[in-house]
A protein has these predicted regions:
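Flexible hinge motifs at transmembrane-helix junctions and intramembrane kinks/re-entrant loops
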Residues: 25-41, 53, 58, 62, ...
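C-terminal ends of transmembrane helices
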Residues: 21-33, 79-91, 180, 257-271, ...
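Membrane-embedded hairpin module used as a gating/binding unit in multi-pass transport
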Residues: 18-19, 170-263
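Alpha-helical membrane segments and immediately flanking helix-loop junctions
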Residues: 117-157, 161, 168, 180, ...
C-alpha cells in the first residue's frame, strides 16, 4: 500500500483547509448547527473518512507530521489555565461554586463508569476514560488533545475512540437537555409556556473588543507559561512516578500567573485576547487531530463503546434529575441550569447555551442560568477535568 507522507507544514495547511471546509458545511447543513457540531470536527472527520476509504480499498494511506499539532494543543490548554481566576470564582456566588462541585463529581463518575464498563467487557480501562470525561465533559477539543496520551499509555486508537465518543456526546447532549428541562418544568409546575416566541438570544458567536498591544502581552504570557510549564511537567512526572500529559505544567503555570497578576494588579489581564488566541489554536489543532484519525481502529471496540456510551447517557440523565435539579434549588432556574449542565456535561458550552436558548424561547429567560453555566462550563470546568484525567491516566496506565 502506498504511504503518502505530509511534513508539518503540509499538515498545517491541511488543518487550515479542513477547518475552512467545516465552516462551509456547518453553514450549508442546518442539522450540524442545530446540534452545535464544531466546524473543525466536521472538516477533520471528512478527511478522516476519505483517508479510511483509501486505506480500506488498499489504495493508499495518508500520514503527516503532528509536531505543530502538539504545539497548538499546548497553547490551547495554556489558555484554559488563564481562565481560572480564584477571585472571580469566589465572587461569582454560591450557585457557581455548587455547580462546579457537581461538575467535578460528574467528571469522576463518568470516568468510573466508562472504565468499569470497559474492564467488565475485557478491554483496557483507559478506553473507558476515552468514553468518560475526556469525551463527555471534555468535548472534541479535550478528546483530540488528550487522546494521544491514551495512545502513549497503551490504549492504541485512544484518540479515535475519544473523538468518536465526543461526537456522540455532542449529539445526545443536544437531544436530551431541552426535553429533560421541559419535563422538570411541567412536572413541578415551574412556569407557564409563553404564548409566542419572545426571547432571541444569540448563542453562536462571542464578540470581543481586542487591542493589538494586549495581543502582544497575551502572546508573551502564553509563550512564557508554555516554556516554563514544560519544565514543571517534567518535574511533576519525576516527583510523582507517573507520566503527566505534556500540557499540564503549562496549564498550572498559567493559573499561577493569572492569579498573581489579578492579586497584585500588575496589569490589566488581556482575557479577551487570550480567549481569542485559545479559540484560534483550538480550531487548528482540532482540525489537524481529526484529520489524522484512523477510523479503522474502531472496529474491535464498537460494541464496548456502544455499551459504555449508553451507560454514560443513563448516568447523565439520572444525575441531572436526582442530583443537579434538587441541589440547584428545584425552581425554574434549576431546570434551566439542568438543561445547560447536560449540554456541557456531554458536549460543550455551546451545546449548553443552545439547550437553554431552546427552553427560554418556550418558557422565558433565566438570567441566573445564563450567568452560572458559562462560568462553570466555559471557564473553570476544563481545568478540573484535565487535572482529574491526568491523575486517572497515571493510575490506570
Amino acid at each position: 500500500m502506498t504511504e503518502i507522507q505530509l511534513n508539518m507544514y503540509h499538515a498545517l495547511a491541511l488543518g487550515a483547509a479542513m477547518y475552512a471546509l467545516g465552516l462551509v458545511l456547518t453553514k450549508k447543513l442546518p442539522v450540524l448547527s442545530r446540534f452545535c457540531i464544531p466546524a473543525p470536527l466536521v472538516g477533520g472527520l471528512c478527511f478522516a473518512i476519505f483517508n479510511t476509504i483509501l486505506y480500506a480499498t488498499g489504495t493508499a494511506v495518508i500520514t503527516f507530521d503532528d509536531t505543530l499539532q502538539t504545539v497548538f494543543m499546548i497553547f490551547f490548554f495554556t489558555t484554559v489555565g488563564f481562565t481560572v481566576s480564584i477571585p472571580m470564582l469566589l465572587k461569582s456566588g454560591k450557585s457557581v461554586i455548587m455547580l462546579l462541585i457537581l461538575s467535578v463529581v460528574m467528571i469522576i463518575l463518568q470516568n468510573v463508569v466508562g472504565s468499569g464498563v470497559m474492564a467488565l467487557m475485557g478491554k483496557d480501562p483507559l478506553y473507558g476514560l476515552a468514553c468518560g470525561s475526556i469525551a463527555m465533559i471534555g468535548g472534541p477539543g479535550t478528546a483530540a488533545g488528550i487522546g494521544p496520551d491514551l495512545d502513549a499509555a497503551g490504549a492504541i486508537g485512544g484518540t479515535t475512540v475519544a473523538v468518536a465518543a465526543a461526537t456522540f456526546g455532542l449529539i445526545f447532549g443536544s437531544l436530551l437537555g431541552g426535553p429533560i428541562a421541559r419535563k422538570l418544568i411541567v412536572k413541578n409546575h415551574l412556569r407557564d409556556e409563553l404564548a409566542e416566541q419572545t426571547v432571541e438570544e444569540d448563542v453562536d458567536d462571542t464578540h470581543y473588543n481586542t487591542h493589538a498591544n494586549n495581543f502582544v502581552y497575551g502572546f508573551l504570557l502564553l509563550m512564557f507559561c508554555a516554556g516554563v510549564g514544560n519544565v514543571v511537567s517534567v518535574l511533576l512526572t519525576n516527583l510523582c512516578g507517573f507520566s503527566f500529559p505534556i500540557y499540564i505544567g503549562s496549564m498550572l503555570v498559567a493559573v499561577v500567573i493569572r492569579n498573581v497578576i489579578d492579586h497584585f494588579k500588575i496589569m490589566e489581564f488581556p482575557a479577551a485576547e487570550i480567549s481569542t488566541m485559545g479559540n484560534m489554536f483550538l480550531a487548528i489543532f482540532l482540525s489537524m487531530a481529526l484529520s489524522g484519525l484512523k477510523l479503522w481502529q474502531l472496529v474491535d471496540l464498537a460494541l464496548p463503546m456502544i455499551v459504555a456510551l449508553a451507560a454514560e447517557v443513563l448516568l447523565m440523565v439520572v444525575f441531572s434529575l436526582l442530583v443537579v435539579f434538587p441541589v440547584m434549588g428545584r425552581d425554574y432556574d434549576a431546570a434551566m441550569i439542568t438543561a445547560g449542565f447536560i449540554g456541557f456535561g456531554m458536549g460543550a458550552t455551546s451545546n449548553a447555551m443552545a439547550n437553554m436558548q431552546a427552553v427560554s424561547r418556550r418558557y422565558g429567560p433565566s438570567p441566573s442560568a445564563y450567568f452560572v453555566i458559562p462560568m462553570v462550563g466555559g471557564l473553570f470546568n476544563d481545568f478540573f477535568n484535565a487535572a482529574i484525567i491526568a491523575f486517572c491516566i497515571g493510575l490506570l496506565a
